[in-house]
Swiss-Prot record:
SUPFAM superfamilies: PLP-dependent transferases. The modification N6-(pyridoxal phosphate)lysine is found at residue 235. Its cofactor is pyridoxal 5'-phosphate. It is found in: Cytoplasm. GO terms for biological process: glycine biosynthetic process from serine; tetrahydrofolate interconversion. (6S)-5,6,7,8-tetrahydrofolate binds at residues 126, 130-132, 359-361. Transmembrane segments: none annotated. Its EC number is 2.1.2.1. Catalyzes the reversible interconversion of serine and glycine with tetrahydrofolate (THF) serving as the one-carbon carrier. This reaction serves as the major source of one-carbon groups required for the biosynthesis of purines, thymidylate, methionine, and other important biomolecules. Also exhibits THF-independent aldolase activity toward beta-hydroxyamino acids, producing glycine and aldehydes, via a retro-aldol mechanism. This is Serine hydroxymethyltransferase. Pfam families: SHMT.
Length: 429
């Protein structure tokens, strides 16, 4: 028998590609030694990463379970069925498709199933907290459809449901989209359902940012009210990067299945679907509810402390994991603030605020999220410390001594709340 132990297929990453292994180690170190406040990011469990890094990456499986175009799918069929069952249980849905590669892919599949080019859609303006796929002119959704956009009230910086209703009555959209990427308040899905029924529109909820909160019962669920719900599987859900489509009515199921495959994708990523199944299973456990409650409590603590430090927060607070700072209150742009906090190992992102006078490349806002640091074990007291570091840095941008102290405080927080315990093995170990 030929000895294949030295074959390239058996080489470790360190041996096969030390350049990539080294860069992975650097990213691992960054995650461990920086404070992650990007609202769309989180840290998965080791189990999720183990599933995603498994031999399932080798398997092609076009089609749905037991309706594949390839042989040898009996095990990935069982895995995908388990992911579907868990997703339906987690969100109380009648049907689920776990194959979308991303939230954007999930949204595109919904458009393909329900709309024709030129149809009218009603979605939130990107600069008010919407998403690119909700009709932004730079996205395919804004190029293929007639887009009408709504925003928030200028005074309250919250959704004005009567204003949205008037737009719907005027333009008669075929699809109304709710669910956002930078809206810190709760969404009244029942009110959107009422508007959709009044104008005869389909209702899509994109709950990508709040899916984990919905699963835990911390935010109202869109599933009972919407014709279709899309989400990512990372963010507050704490799974792998991927997408998911849910609906409450089996009438739509076949249309959405066909819109995913063959309509907009080829073979599903079965290794990612396995990781989704693991994450759904984790989210079904009681401790995930406690985690999600802490995510919101931490966001509210962060927002309150920053307001005490005289930094304005859009809408005056938050009901979810997002805290959106309006930096006009301290005479600063989001672009500058992003660089300043990055210098002290805090990762966030510049973001437009409602009625922003700055361009999307500059912005007047800084978006923060609490999901990732809550995974590390941060509580309200720790987030008060985080808020003080942010405020000290932004309010003293030229003070080198304060910058050095901020770096020390960030380092101390990272040591007090390690990311993984025990730590992950370096790829170059």
């Amino acid at each position: 028998m030929t000895d294949r132990s030295a074959a390239p297929i058996n080489a470790s990453l360190k041996a096969a590609d030390p350049a990539i292994a080294g860069l992975i180690d650097q990213e691992q170190m960054r995650q461990e030694t920086h404070l992650e406040l990007i609202a769309s990011e989180n840290f998965t469990s080791k189990a999720v990463m183990e599933a995603q890094g498994s031999v399932l990456t080798n398997k092609y499986a076009e089609g749905l379970p037991h309706k594949r175009y390839y042989g040898g799918c009996e095990h990935v069929d069982a895995i995908e069925e388990l992911a579907i069952t868990r997703a339906k249980q987690l969100f109380g849905a009648a049907w689920a498709n776990v194959q979308p590669h991303s939230g954007a892919q999930a949204n595109f599949a919904v458009f393909l199933a329900l709309l024709q080019p030129g149809d009218t859609i009603l979605g939130m303006d990107l600069s008010h907290g919407g998403h690119l796929t909700h009709g932004s002119p730079v996205n395919v959704s804004g190029k293929w459809f007639n887009v009408v956009q709504y925003g928030v009230d200028k005074e309250t910086q919250r959704l004005d449901m009567e204003a949205i209703r008037k737009l719907a009555l005027e333009h008669k959209p075929k699809l109304i989209i709710c669910g956002y990427s930078a809206y810190p308040r709760s969404i009244d899905f029942a009110a959107f359902r009422s508007i959709a029924d009044e104008v005869g529109a389909y209702l899509l909820a994109d709950m990508a940012h709040i899916a984990g909160l919905v699963a835990a019962g911390v935010h109202a669920s869109p599933v009972p009210h919407c014709d279709v719900v899309t989400t990512t599987t990372h963010k507050t859900l704490r799974g792998p990067r991927g997408g998911l489509i849910l609906c409450r009515d089996a009438e739509f199921a076949r249309r959405f299945d066909k819109a995913v495959f063959p309509g907009s994708q080829g073979g599903p990523l079965e290794h990612v679907i396995a990781a989704k199944a693991v994450a759904f299973g984790e989210a079904l456990q009681p401790d995930f509810k406690a985690y999600s409650r802490q995510v919101v409590a931490n966001a509210q603590a962060l927002a309150a402390r920053l307001q005490e430090r005289k930094i304005d927060v859009v809408s005056g607070g938050t009901d979810n994991h997002v805290v959106l700072l309006d930096l006009r209150s301290i005479g600063m742009t989001g672009k500058v603030a992003d660089l300043l906090v990055s210098d002290v190992h805090i990762t966030a992102n510049k973001n437009t605020v409602p009625f922003d006078p700055e361009s999307p490349f500059v912005t007047s806002g800084l978006r923060l999220g609490t999901a990732a640091l809550t995974t590390r074990g941060f509580d309200e007291k720790a987030f008060h410390e985080v808020a003080d570091v942010i405020a000290d840095r932004l309010q003293n941008p030229e003070d080198d001594a304060i910058q050095a102290r901020c770096l020390e405080r960030v380092s101390d927080l990272c040591k007090r709340f390690p990311l993984y315990a025990p730590a992950l093995e370096p790829a170059l170990a």
